[in-house]
Amino acid sequence: MLRLGSLASREVRMSNDYRFGIEEEFFVVDAETKAALRRMPSGFFDALRDRLGDSITVELLQSQLEMATAPTDRIGDALDELRDLRHIAGRVAAEHGLGFIAAGTHPTASWDNVRATKANRYDGLMQDLQMLGERNMVCGLHVHVELPDPDLRVDVMRRITPYLPHFIALSTSSPFWGSRQTGLMGYRLAAYDELPRTGLPELFEDNAAYEEYVAALVGARAISDSSYVWWAIRPSQKHPTLELRAPDACTRVEDAVALAALYRSLVRFLVRHPEHHRHIGAVDRAIANENKWRAQRYGIHGSFVDLAEQRAIQVRDALDQLIALVADDAEDLGCLDALLHLRTIPDAGTSADMQIAVYQEAHHRTGNRGEALQAVKTWLAHATLQ
């Protein structure tokens, strides 16, 4: 959970240096077999809390944990803190015969073989979601950017919609599900979007319309509050932020920070250019949904539908266009180098590309699917702590 403190005065509330924070979800695994845990061992989370404080929190399922940075306006601080969180948690895990994997899905985990975390919120969720809650064996990357004005948060949420598939394509890390290669580079959202109130947000005209939607659901007792709205991007219920939730968990910490730099820069660009996507409508959202699917299916190797040109554009070309769009903002925010790291991903590959390559090499060498999947898990556990 992001640790953004309350803002004390109107002057502070109305200022904005686009502070941001990053939340990463992880699978907790057996150190030897790399299998996802069924139950959290007694004392393990307490040991993590002793070392990391409230930077680490439990998740819906006992096989998962979340680590979060403190809010900052310095991209280097976020990178250093993410590395420290991973390394410290990794050392504590090793003392308990455990490890961590950062990926959108665990390659071999069986969703029907895990247990929910005991907590009032999670008990209620499992009662409501039933089997869908059990199938929520997925891990994502969440980035908060501070926008004190609620109307501005909803305005940016609407106008950023066409760019959400870019974040999905660049972060794909979930090509396996239940010991099978899915054929998708990012299977995570296929599973996650089984839940209600997921996917792309509706195109709310302003914060009043968004609050009316939330109030209707709360009044009908469909949800308790807006934290039960799980779109790919949403106004935070607890913090004065707009929270990006579209990306898969990133195996490489540098990729996570680069995506945070892109998101922060894009938010600033949209604030500075209120006319950009001002008249976004149903067709734009429909095209964004198509591109979301294409990002899940093909990752960085596919193409997006360009609505204005009515043609396909390669993802790497769309990425170049987006980087050029926000480069000035990234430079002003001091995160241009992190942003430019994204240009290395189409050539180096995402985590999904690496997992598939490891699987294919091991399968070619051994002829055994089980050993090939084990090689993928071993690579993931190692790369997560690099």
Curated annotation (Swiss-Prot):
Catalytic activity field: L-cysteine + L-glutamate + ATP = gamma-L-glutamyl-L-cysteine + ADP + phosphate + H(+)
Enzyme class name: ligase
Sorted UniProt keywords: ATP-binding, Ligase, Nucleotide-binding
Gene3D superfamilies, per database record: 3.30.590.20
Domain of life: Bacteria
EC assignment: 6.3.2.2
InterPro entries xrefs: GCL_type2/YbdK_subfam, GCS2, Gln_synth/guanido_kin_cat_dom, YbdK
Biological process annotations from GO: modified amino acid biosynthetic process
Signal peptide from the UniProt entry: none
Coiled coil: none
An annotated Gene Ontology molecular function: glutamate-cysteine ligase activity
Similarity comment: family membership: Belongs to the glutamate--cysteine ligase type 2 family. YbdK subfamily.
Role summary: ATP-dependent carboxylate-amine ligase which exhibits weak glutamate--cysteine ligase activity.
Name by which UniProt lists this protein: Putative glutamate--cysteine ligase 2
Organism: Azorhizobium caulinodans (strain ATCC 43989 / DSM 5975 / JCM 20966 / LMG 6465 / NBRC 14845 / NCIMB 13405 / ORS 571)
Taxonomic path: Bacteria, Pseudomonadati, Pseudomonadota, Alphaproteobacteria, Hyphomicrobiales
